[in-house]
Curated annotation (Swiss-Prot):
May interact with CcsA. Belongs to the Ccs1/CcsB family. PANTHER family: CYTOCHROME C BIOGENESIS PROTEIN CCS1, CHLOROPLASTIC. This is Cytochrome c biogenesis protein Ccs1. It is found in: Plastid, Chloroplast thylakoid membrane. The keyword Membrane applies. GO terms for biological process: cytochrome complex assembly. It is a multi-pass membrane protein. InterPro entries: Cyt_c_bgen_Ccs1/CcsB/ResB (IPR023494), ResB-like_domain (IPR007816). The chain crosses the membrane at residues 19-39, 78-98, 164-184. Pfam families: ResB.
Length: 440
């Protein structure tokens, strides 16, 4: 019973390790990924109804009903997609277990040549005096060869590490697959628009995996927000001063972030993505402080912010406020649309009938994207293994055999890479072995 179970397991592993199956699975994954690139993922239903209407289906059948019925809009989190990826991972593991690891073990074993005729197939060989057989063992050992001797036969190999490359490639692919699966199941993305000085929790969930956990024990505070400009008055960079608070409101980490410089804490990365101006805080007649909301208007690729306020209670003196950016210039227009003042924060603007105002502060918001991907480290590890495997794959695996006859000693060798370099090293080794005769 145990024997039949073991035999069945061996047959199953060999079928899983079949190269044709692995190629077919890899091609299927590639096609699905390409399909996921073509069809936008994780969008609202209205998006697919608008872009893939039933009145004009692509190829005559691809419409929003077709996409949603097959879950092509959430391709990378589908159970059947994970099934194919898992099947491919099983094929790689089976190949590693049944082919690569046994081959590596075989290369570690000695492989003696038992007769002189077997040496004829080697192009690289040399006849030496019979008494140099033992000398060759010490010479090769000093060249970092693993040397074995049995009776009149020698065997040596070097560069076994180069044979580990295929195994590392397999594991790097496995780590990519597992890392991607962990990210899809346990990761999430949150988008937040937060006014300066406000404290917020993660609420506006854009994307999340079935096993993701949002850290509600943390809160976040936007301490400050500002923008730097180029000499041409174009946005150079925008910054957010962020703090992470624990359940007691104590600050556990603080950092100034900007584009491509996120804040990272316990696997959560906070990226700077956008910004906006909500309004202006101003003081009327040096008495009443009010907040004026501003509306964002985009025209010809530029953004403007407009707002209005009445200077008196009779609603007669209405002014319009215009902002181009946060450089400090504020443009004030009257009821007729005429520019009456260009001012900055803190400056007093005087109007007829003893009316005045003073702009005090910009009310800004910062756009933040918060992400957690638990599989990211596995993916980084896979890239590292790929680089290591590329490096060690260039290491030559060299083998040298020795066979003693009645009156001579035959030395032969071969290498899987850098054949010319191995030939030169082989000739050099033979020369050094012969040189030992001069000292004896």
């Amino acid at each position: 019973m145990v024997f039949s179970t073991k035999l069945y397991t061996t047959k199953l592993l060999k079928k899983l390790a079949d190269l044709r199956l692995a190629i077919w699975l890899l091609a299927s994954i590639g096609i699905l990924i390409a399909l996921g690139t073509f069809i936008e993922q994780d969008q609202p239903l209205a998006f697919y109804q608008e872009n893939y209407p039933t009145t004009a289906p692509i190829l005559g059948f691809v419409d929003w009903k077709f996409i949603t019925s097959l879950n092509l809009n959430t391709l990378y989190s589908n159970i059947w997609f994970f099934g194919i990826v898992g099947f491919f991972a099983s094929s790689l593991l089976a190949c590693t277990y049944t082919t690569q690891i046994p081959a590596l073990k075989k290369f570690r074993l000695w492989e003696f040549i038992t007769n002189f005729k077997s040496l004829r197939k080697f192009q690289l060989k040399r006849q030496l005096p019979r008494n140099l057989a033992s000398t060759s063992v010490y010479q090769l050992y000093g060249k970092n060869y693993h040397v074995f001797r049995q009776g009149k036969k020698n065997y040596a190999y070097s560069g076994l590490l180069g044979r580990v490359g295929p195994i590392l490639v397999h594991f790097s692919i496995l780590f990519v697959l597992f890392g991607s699966a962990c990210g899809a199941l346990g990761g999430y993305t949150v988008q937040e628009i937060v006014p300066r000085g406000e404290i917020f929790h993660l609420q506006n969930l854009v994307k999340s995996g079935n096993l993701s956990k949002i850290p509600q024990y943390l809160s976040w505070r936007v301490n400050d927000f500002w923008i730097t400009y180029t000499e041409e008055a174009k946005v150079n960079q925008f910054y957010s001063d962020l703090s992470i608070l624990d359940v007691k409101g104590q600050e556990v980490k603080r950092k100034i972030i900007f584009v491509n410089e996120p804040l990272v804490y316990n696997g959560v990365s906070v990226y700077q993505t956008d910004w906006d101006i909500l309004g202006l805080k101003l003081k009327l007649n040096d008495q009443q402080t009010i907040q004026v909301p501003l509306n964002k208007i985009s025209k010809s690729g530029r953004n403007f912010w407009l707002g209005s306020v009445f200077l008196d209670g009779n609603s007669k003196q209405k002014i319009t406020i215009l902002l181009n950016d946060l450089t400090g210039n504020i443009y004030v227009y009257d009821n007729a649309g005429l520019l009456v003042a260009t001012t900055k924060l803190g400056q007093l603007v005087v109007f007829p009938e003893d009316q005045s105002l003073r702009f005090q502060e910009f009310l800004t918001t910062t756009g933040l994207q918060l992400k957690e991907d638990p599989g990211l480290r596995l993916i980084y590890l896979s890239f590292f293994l790929v680089m290591v495997s590329i490096y060690i794959s260039f290491l030559s695996y060299s083998q040298i055999w020795g066979f003693e006859k009645t009156d001579e000693f035959i030395l032969a060798g071969k290498s899987n890479r850098a054949v010319l370099a191995f030939q030169e090293d082989f000739k050099k080794d033979v020369k050094e072995i012969l040189n030992t005769l001069k000292f004896n």
